[in-house]
Amino acid sequence: MRKSAAPKRPVVKDPVYDSELVTQLVNKILLDGKKSTAERIVYGALEICREKTGLEPVGTLEKALGNVRPDLEVRSRRVGGATYQVPVEVRPARATTLALRWLVTFTRQRRENTMVERLANEIMDAANGLGASVKRREDTHKMAEANRAFAHYRW
């Protein structure tokens, strides 16, 4: 094991919206090192959000992530011979990472024609409290609530 925790590397703000969240989203969309393609997808999706909602796209993205960020999750903990699903609070950085991961995962599973449309619609759905990524958060919270009896095994 390493002696101390690895230092968090600073996230560079993206040039268009001056937002760390947009940079993180671009990096999550990224496949095979094609960053310009990932940027085109994200910026296109945010533009569609601006046209359809008439609001600032970064605000819409933040609202969407706020609706997708989990507060609790379950982690496996072995006690004796049994493995318990122990509910734990999610640290803010991990909550954001999970929210972005779920957003991108469920964007890829959508049925619209282009990735730009899929991402835009998933962001707008999440901002309105709909969509598969919000459902994933609710399921995660339900799991934590169901296993509340094991909360005293927290570490």
Swiss-Prot record:
Disulfide bond annotation, renumbered to this chain: none
Where does the chain cross the membrane?
Answer: none
Listed A to Z, the keywords are:
Ribonucleoprotein, Ribosomal protein, RNA-binding, rRNA-binding, tRNA-binding
Query: Mind naming one GO cellular-component term on file for this protein?
Result: small ribosomal subunit
Q: Which SUPFAM superfamilies match?
A: Ribosomal protein S7 (SSF47973)
MF annotations from Gene Ontology: rRNA binding; structural constituent of ribosome; tRNA binding
* Keyword Ribonucleoprotein carried by entry: yes
Q: What is an annotated GO biological process for this record, any one?
A: translation
HAMAP family linked? Ribosomal_uS7_B (MF_00480_B)
Query: What family does the entry list?
Result: Belongs to the universal ribosomal protein uS7 family.
- Subunit structure comment from the entry: Part of the 30S ribosomal subunit. Contacts proteins S9 and S11.
State the name under which the record lists this protein: Small ribosomal subunit protein uS7
